């Protein structure tokens, strides 16, 4: 069981307590810090839509520290990011693997970043099937179609050729923040030492 911290704010109307994620949301920050499944994707998607309705002109910040997850769940978040009017700024801290790497790349151009020790990993979609041979064949075709879709999305956001992406994602393809910048997954590696600037 995870512990979710609460913060207390003083306002002119008294004291108010928020769980930390709700408090971040007030500042237009969405923290994606778990494996991506349908339930979690629904929460992230709802937060994106809420922030768009609240102010369609202000950027939304999506902080990522995730091992990835289900392709369909990740694509629901990705499509919402592309659909809403505000730019979505993405920031990787820790790791952005699998579908989380795709979400990192899917941020607004020029507004995708990572902290210096972040790790990014791309790979092809995985799947498994049991049952009759025809069922396994159907599932294999679906995984290959998803692979084409993911490669096309990476091509759109990185500028790499589909052939290069396909070659690189045949196995787990790990990158440092600087390597991810060179690859086109992100635009900036954040190097600011706040302690020295204060």
Curated annotation (Swiss-Prot):
The active site is at residues 98, 123. PROSITE patterns: CLP_PROTEASE_HIS, CLP_PROTEASE_SER. Its main location: cytoplasm. Pfam families: CLP_protease (PF00574). One of its GO terms (molecular function) is ATP-dependent peptidase activity. Fourteen ClpP subunits assemble into 2 heptameric rings which stack back to back to give a disk-like structure with a central cavity, resembling the structure of eukaryotic proteasomes. Belongs to the peptidase S14 family. This is ATP-dependent Clp protease proteolytic subunit. The gene is clpP.
